[in-house]
């Protein structure tokens, strides 16, 4: 019994290892989707993975998967932490994010470093993409931003 059990265990382990070598392929006619995201960039504009690199990578993914199948998201803390953010209260970074082609963003705690009015002005008048948040409410408990966005691929 022990010998049979060991043999079956070994056979099962071998089958599991062999399954790692079978490539996963999309069904014919199906396209992949790509969700790219950034977070805690803190105004990075000249390091290795700066906005130019993000724009280039997004373009590569759009060439591969189609522009309608690629979504670029920022998960917060983009507009503060560097000279470009400090000199413009974050607005120059938003200009760069618009040029890169962000599809949506989530505010991080540092999006509020330049005061609430500044952030809301950026959201309402400058960003060409929506900011989303399900837990950002005003004094009366009303949502300030949309809580979600449905994207169809």
Where do the PLM segments sit?
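Bacterial N-terminal signal peptides
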Residues: 11-19
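Sec-dependent signal peptide cleavage junction
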Residues: 18-30
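Acidic, metal/ion-coordinating pockets
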Residues: 27-153
